[in-house]
């Protein structure tokens, strides 16, 4: 996995001057950097290359003259500093050719920040390992959760996925409970391929719609 240099039009550094005080307990100084995260992928590593051009009074250590500043995507609901997981439990209903097949579902869901009020998750019981997810997987299984001002959630596909919300704000919303836990409540259906179906005698696969009703709690 390779890092990418963040294009200069995606960030702003108002001043390149900083002061490291002689009596400071810290051995570093800070620069203000503003980044526009819209359109950046949570699956990529972005770097801003910086170099000390000149200093006063002292000589520059050539071994410590350059730094790669890593941009970490983060919002209120997830961060890429470390992988964010929501422990999700609920009901899965497969709408098969032999009728509805209901099962309980439990999945540790990866939640990735996309913008200030949007995250990306995979539908159903599908999941992935950060750093190994493919564009094809995202296109097939990825959906966006947009958290609106009233804390209702709008569900949209990342790519070719067929997904539909069920109900309204009373079924799809975000809250922080009395214990301070962050929770997503979701109710939706999506179309999946090669779904395993079993009856009393046989097991086979078919394409069908699957309805999910779930509650996801952010793991600490």
Indicate where each model-derived feature is located.
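Short, contiguous acidic and Ser/Thr-rich linear segments
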Residues: 20-25
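Intrinsically disordered, low-complexity regulatory regions in eukaryotic proteins
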Residues: 1-17, 28-220
